[in-house]
């Protein structure tokens, strides 16, 4: 069930804390619309939920567990703009006071990070806050100034121009 998923490997947690966590990440109202609410059975790997709903439920689980370290790999990949906004809001709650390693192509996902590390060909080429990386006008600035929501949306020829890679193959 959704409840079992949220409290997975957590002992002695009250239902009230589960509801508080679900509300904090914005998934409670959705759960309450389901016929069996928190007792709704989930299919294998949550197949009967959208990607965004699965993300939000996993965020609620991390809050219930009081996880101190969070690892997110493309938390906002393969979702629509509305769901991305929900997840961005949930991330603010989830990451507050926690250490996080966030792998992201969408700049909005990492904008509020204490430190952003920019990799190119597996090497660190920049690291700082969003504001300082913008001021430094390096690769991060170039990519963000293109106003793409995702690095994946940027055509290869533009990336090659920004990074100075040769256009010929």
What are these regions (language model features)?
Residues 59, 103:
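Hydrophobic anchor residue at the start of the ABC signature
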Residues 65, 96:
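Conserved signature/switch motifs of ABC ATPase nucleotide-binding domains
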Residues 24, 33-37, 89, 111-169:
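C-terminal portion of ABC ATPase nucleotide-binding domains
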Residues 86-94, 106:
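Conserved helical "switch/dimer-interface" subregion of ABC/ABC-like ATPase nucleotide-binding domains
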Residues 70-74:
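Catalytic Walker B motif of ABC-type/P-loop ATPase nucleotide-binding domains
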Residues 3-44, 88, 97:
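ABC ATPase nucleotide-binding domain helical subdomain, centered on the C-loop/LSGGQ "ABC signature"
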Residues 81-82:
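Helix N-cap at the start of a conserved alpha-helix in ABC-type nucleotide-binding domains
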């Amino acid at each position: 069930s959704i409840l079992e998923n949220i409290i997975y490997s957590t002992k002695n947690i009250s239902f009230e804390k589960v509801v508080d966590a679900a509300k904090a990440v914005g998934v409670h109202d959705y759960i309450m619309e389901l016929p069996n609410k928190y007792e709704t059975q989930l299919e294998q790997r949550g197949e009967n939920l959208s990607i965004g709903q699965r993300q939000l439920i996993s965020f609620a689980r991390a809050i219930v567990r009081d996880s101190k370290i969070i690892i997110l790999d493309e938390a906002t990949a393969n979702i629509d703009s509305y769901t991305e906004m929900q997840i961005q809001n949930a991330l603010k709650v989830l990451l507050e006071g926690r250490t996080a390693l966030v792998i992201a192509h969408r700049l909005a996902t990492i904008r509020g990070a204490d430190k952003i590390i920019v990799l190119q060909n597996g090497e660190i080429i920049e690291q700082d806050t969003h504001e300082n990386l913008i001021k430094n006008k390096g690769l991060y600035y170039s990519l963000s100034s293109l106003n793409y929501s995702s690095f994946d949306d940027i055509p290869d020829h533009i990336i090659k121009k920004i990074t100075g890679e040769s256009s010929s193959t």
